[in-house]
Amino acid sequence: MTKALFFDIDGTLVSFETHRIPSSTIEALEAAHAKGLKIFIATGRPKAIINNLSELQDRNLIDGYITMNGAYCFVGEQVIYKSAIPQGEVKAMAAFCEKKGVPCIFVEEHHISVCQPDDMVKKIFYDFLHVNVLPTVSFEEAISNEIIQMTPFITEEEEKEIRPSIPTCEIGRWYPSFADITAKGDTKQKGIDEIIRYFGIKLEETMAFGDGGNDITMLRHAAIGVAMGQAKENVKAAADYVTAPIDEDGISKAMKHFGII
């Protein structure tokens, strides 16, 4: 019996087209929560830029958060798991981005900054994702504190180039223009394990929903993994079930299919 639902945000709960949560999704989550199921967020976003869930938060529908792809998990005000990237690999990524002349976002526990912001940062983070403008700092300043997640604006080819210099890091993508980098082992799969340990829920009682490359680990790990209909084929292949696209009531349809609501 399913007791815990894990949802990615962008492309799963929140439409890339409307930048809103479909009304059918809100109604489905309300119905599930009313039946006693726990609802958790599992996102690549840091806490500070989760700015699009007010329709769920205002209804008290969220029981906990997996953020930064599993590197920072919290329930209410209690941090139940956090993990920093080894400083040597932070320095390697900073040097790589500085040399390439590409932006990189560095995320600390309570602070986010960006180095070398360009039009792509503005287009994606500020205009498209509606993130507040981040402070611009030098690479030296950005890496002076403990870093939990790095988001370099690198291509998949550049990702292959830097990979040997960051051997103990995880690399995930939920948008083609950048990668999210965390410490080794910090994935949404890890986040699920930390959340269910805290709540005393069994893995066989979990269901996860996602659409991006950074969702693959949790779709495979949860008892039931549901891929959104607009997801790429490698994401769909990792899932147990493929539902309709987000803008065609995919969440609601999947939850009805499995008898959750």
Question: For the regions a protein language model found, what residue spans apply to each?
Answer:
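Short active-site oxyanion
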Residues: 36-40, 61-62, 146-150, 204-206, ...
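Asp-based phosphoryl-transfer active-site loop
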Residues: 3-18
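Active-site phosphate-binding/coordination module
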Residues: 23-120
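Non-catalytic pre-domain segments flanking phosphatase-related domains
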Residues: 1-7, 30, 34, 201
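Mg2+-dependent phosphoryl-transfer enzymes with acidic/Ser/Thr/Gly-rich catalytic loops
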Residues: 2-4, 22, 181-261
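Short, hinge-like loop/turn segments at secondary-structure boundaries
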Residues: 57-60, 81-84, 121-125, 190, ...
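Conserved acidic, metal-coordinating active-site core of Asp-based
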Residues: 96, 100-209, 213-218, 230
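Short, structured coil segments at secondary-structure junctions
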Residues: 60-61, 69, 165-168, 221-222, ...
